[in-house]
Amino acid sequence: MKKIIFYSYLKCSTCRKAVKWLDKENLEYQLIDIVEEPPLSKYLNLAFEQNSEKKRIFNTRGKAFKSIDLDINGLSREKIIQLLLSDGKLIKRPFLIFGEKIILGFNEAEYSNHLL
C-alpha cells in the first residue's frame, strides 16, 4: 500500500479535522509539521502540475499570505516554490501526499475517493 505523508499545522482546525478522519478510517500516515519542515520542492512541483491555479497552492486565508503583497500570477514556478519553502505557513494545508497524488486542504469526499 502507498504511504500517506501528511503535512499539518497544529493550530489549524482543518488539519485537525483531517487527522480525525484519517484516524477514524484507521489509515496510517506520517505526520509532519508544515511550518518546521515544509514539503520538498519535488512535492510542491507535483502540486503545481495537479492544480491549474497557482493561488490554489497558497494558504490565502492566513496571515503570512496576507502580509506579502505579491502578484503570484506574475511569478515563475521556481520563484513561487522558493517562496513557499521559505515559510511553511504560506502553503495550503493540510498538504497530503499519497503516491504521486497531492491533496490540498481537506474534503472528506476527496480523501475517501483517493485513500480508501
For each feature predicted by the language model, list its residue ranges:
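Thiol/selenol-based redox catalytic cores and closely related redox-interacting motifs
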Residues: E36-L116
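Local sequence-structure signature of Cys/Sec-based thiol-disulfide redox active-site neighborhoods
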Residues: M1-E25, Y29-I34
